[in-house]
């Protein structure tokens, strides 16, 4: 029986990817549809994706599929043909092509079965996830941005909103999508008669959020088709003004796509304008934060003097210090509370 998961070290796989000469295309897609046997579907997809040398991260659940992947340029057509024919529900599913892509977004294929493709925390048997808001295309988005009766809601996390968002969009302050849903309903009560436009990176979160808002009694609900990625692509193709300001955070090695030249965030250590996310180089931390080149050199890529000092200790001493620490202090921690606690973020100058 073939091995349906990776057994090679991350370091080796990354070296192989960096040594490749063929360009790669970063693609994301999702689809809410019923999958009777997620594990069987996962195994069949894994075999096919691996045969096409696809890297990336794919989640499957009874409710559908969510994927961010990297495909060799010469295999994109074959990948599209396979995906569209794999299940009738996936025929002509929208493929979001990355805007700012060096082809180095992923170096391993990880495919997992989960309870949900988006962790929403919804436990309401009457909720109909298919009763979504209306789609908005790029020109319609721009028109809504000029409509005084419209309210744009950003359904992404605080660290995503911080580096880029639509003009005057509201942030729902929360660390996770599941926390945002009830807060969005609460915050929008005073705007119940307004037009509510929801958006996210590629569409998967705002689509479900639009259904939740309708379920919660809001009648005028829209969401941006294909999210920020599709909006920016279509606006550029059609010669429309791109009204998204800053950078679009993405969940891969790139950590962001440049949409406009505006730098709206600041280094979390010195306050200088900067929108470059990084993970603290201390293996006992890995906090996600924004760091300018000067501070990166000063702190050795770490989030604090303490982490900088710890990162150069002998490996055995580092392991001893890490022992017993909470898992919440480990890889890719993005909590706003932890960010503020560790860094004491300065006011922008």
From Swiss-Prot:
Belongs to the TrhO family. Residues 316-349 are annotated as: Disordered. It comes from Enterobacter sp. (strain 638). One of its GO terms (biological process) is tRNA modification. This is tRNA uridine(34) hydroxylase. The active site is at residue 200. The keyword Cell division does not apply. Keywords: Oxidoreductase, tRNA processing. Residues 316-328 have a biased composition (Basic and acidic residues). Its EC number is 1.14.-.-. The keyword Oxidoreductase applies. Gene3D superfamilies: 3.30.70.100, Rhodanese-like domain. Residues 146-240 form the Rhodanese domain. It catalyses: uridine(34) in tRNA + AH2 + O2 = 5-hydroxyuridine(34) in tRNA + A + H2O. It is an enzyme of class 1 (oxidoreductase). Catalyzes oxygen-dependent 5-hydroxyuridine (ho5U) modification at position 34 in tRNAs. PROSITE patterns: RHODANESE_3 (PS50206). SMART domains: RHOD. GO terms for molecular function: oxidoreductase activity, acting on paired donors, with incorporation or reduction of molecular oxygen. Signal peptide: none annotated. NCBIfam families: PRK00142.1-1 (NF001133). Disulfide bonds: none annotated.
């Amino acid at each position: 029986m073939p091995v349906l998961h990776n057994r090679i070290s991350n370091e080796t796989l990354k070296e192989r990817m960096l040594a490749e000469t063929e360009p790669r295309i970063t693609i994301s897609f999702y689809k809410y549809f019923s999958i009777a046997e997620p594990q069987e579907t996962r195994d069949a997809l894994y075999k096919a994706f691996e045969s096409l040398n696809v890297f990336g991260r794919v989640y499957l659940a009874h409710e559908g599929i969510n994927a961010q992947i990297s495909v060799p340029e010469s295999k994109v057509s074959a990948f599209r043909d396979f995906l569209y024919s794999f299940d009738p529900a996936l025929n002509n599913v929208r493929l979001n092509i990355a805007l700012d892509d060096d082809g180095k977004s992923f170096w391993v294929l990880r495919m997992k079965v989960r309870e949900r493709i988006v962790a929403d925390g919804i436990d309401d048997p009457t909720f109909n996830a298919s009763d979504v808001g209306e789609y908005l295309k790029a020109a319609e988005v721009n028109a809504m941005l000029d409509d005084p009766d419209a309210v744009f809601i950003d359904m992404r996390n605080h660290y995503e909103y911080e580096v880029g968002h639509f003009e005057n969009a509201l942030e729902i302050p929360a660390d996770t999508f599941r926390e945002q849903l009830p807060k969005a309903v609460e915050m929008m009560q005073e705007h119940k008669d307004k037009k509510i436009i929801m958006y996210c990176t590629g569409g998967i979160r705002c689509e479900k959020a639009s259904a939740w808002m309708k379920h919660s009694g809001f009648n005028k609900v829209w969401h941006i088709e294909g999210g920020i990625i599709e909006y920016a692509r279509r606006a550029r193709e059609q010669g429309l003004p791109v009204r998204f300001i800053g950078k679009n955070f993405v969940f891969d090695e790139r950590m962001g796509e440049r949409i406009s030249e505006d730098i709206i965030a600041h280094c979390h250590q010195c306050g200088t304008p900067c929108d470059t996310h990084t993970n603290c180089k201390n293996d006992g931390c890995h906090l996600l934060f924004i760091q300018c080149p000067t501070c990166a050199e000063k702190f050795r890529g770490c989030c604090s003097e303490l982490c900088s000092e710890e990162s150069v200790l002998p490996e055995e001493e580092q392991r001893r210090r890490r022992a017993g620490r909470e898992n919440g202090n480990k890889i890719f921690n993005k909590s706003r509370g932890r960010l503020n606690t560790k860094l004491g973020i300065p006011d922008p100058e």
